[in-house]
Amino acid sequence: MKMRKGIILAGGSGTRLYPVTMAVSKQLLPIYDKPMIYYPLSTLMLAGIRDILIISTPQDTPRFQQLLGDGSQWGLNLQYKVQPSPDGLAQAFIIGEEFIGGDDCALVLGDNIFYGHDLPKLMEAAVNKESGATVFAYHVNDPERYGVVEFDKNGTAISLEEKPLEPKSNYAVTGLYFYDNDVVQMAKNLKPSARGELEITDINRIYLEQGRLSVAMMGRGYAWLDTGTHQSLIEASNFIATIEERQGLKVSCPEEIAFRKGFIDVEQVRKLAVPLIKNNYGQYLYKMTKDSN
């Protein structure tokens, strides 16, 4: 099986969240008890991906480096690249060409939160796919805000549209994508859309036309949260808080995922818990080390 690398696109100007994001990246804002970027990072980790590129703006990249470092504390290899201006999601593959090399890759948007017991299993099928692309569809009330996938009566994807005025279904394409290495050349060959961007929907449409696009359904039991508005930030925080307080288990905790997947050992978890020990997060990590003995 080929190696698969991960990209987190954490750029953009976050204008819909002004004035909150006038001085700080949206992806550094808190979602309950952790920075937003921990959630997409955890998604890639749950897929078993350890080589990850974070793409952000010139002003925000140093802040992500300060927060996340080189990733070695979690058994990861984190690298960074700058996106000078937000010219479309597909630009991530051009910026990340050297990082991707000859490998397959996954892209997750830095403001997307995924939750579900079977999420690792769902992603495993995408990771193990030898060629082509996999995207994930989720039923929404407001499909006109997203890329929309249309299915025939057999459940086969037949069309993709970006933010259509009259959506052909209620299934939105989420901000998590798995591609083979062909995606790099496809991105380089793309023409900007009417709004001047290199559209991820155009990449997905090429794979669809070639008969190489798989659409995996995130059905009942999954949550996909898009945190682009003030209201959705509150809703996402409340969602995470409700689950964590009810179960006593953390959602998207990189330290825990790294430990459970064998990226780091119990001693490293203990070391990571020390500077956080005055709050619930650090105490949770410390308790985890005691329980594992």
From Swiss-Prot:
Cofactor(s) for this UniProt protein: Mg(2+)
Keyword set, alphabetical order: Lipopolysaccharide biosynthesis, Magnesium, Metal-binding, Nucleotidyltransferase, Transferase
Catalytic activity: dTTP + alpha-D-glucose 1-phosphate + H(+) = dTDP-alpha-D-glucose + diphosphate
Task of the protein: Catalyzes the formation of dTDP-glucose, from dTTP and glucose 1-phosphate, as well as its pyrophosphorolysis.
Family to which this protein belongs: Belongs to the glucose-1-phosphate thymidylyltransferase family.
Assembly: Homotetramer.
SUPFAM superfamilies: Nucleotide-diphospho-sugar transferases
InterPro entries, per the entry: G1P_thy_trans_s, NTP_transferase_dom, Nucleotide-diphossugar_trans
Comment on pH dependence: Optimum pH is 8.0-8.5. Active from pH 6.0 to 10.0.
Pathway linked to the protein: Carbohydrate biosynthesis; dTDP-L-rhamnose biosynthesis; Bacterial outer membrane biogenesis; LPS O-antigen biosynthesis
Annotated protein name in UniProt: Glucose-1-phosphate thymidylyltransferase 1
Cofactor note text: Binds 1 Mg(2+) ion per subunit.
Other facts noted in the record for this chain: Both catalyzed reactions, i.e. dTDP-glucose biosynthesis and pyrophosphorolysis, follow a sequential ordered bi-bi catalytic mechanism.
Any one Gene Ontology cellular component term annotated for this protein: cytosol
Gene that this polypeptide is encoded by: rfbA
Domain of life of the native organism: Bacteria
Disulfide bonding pattern of the chain: none
Residue numbers binding Mg(2+): D111, D226
One GO molecular-function entry: identical protein binding
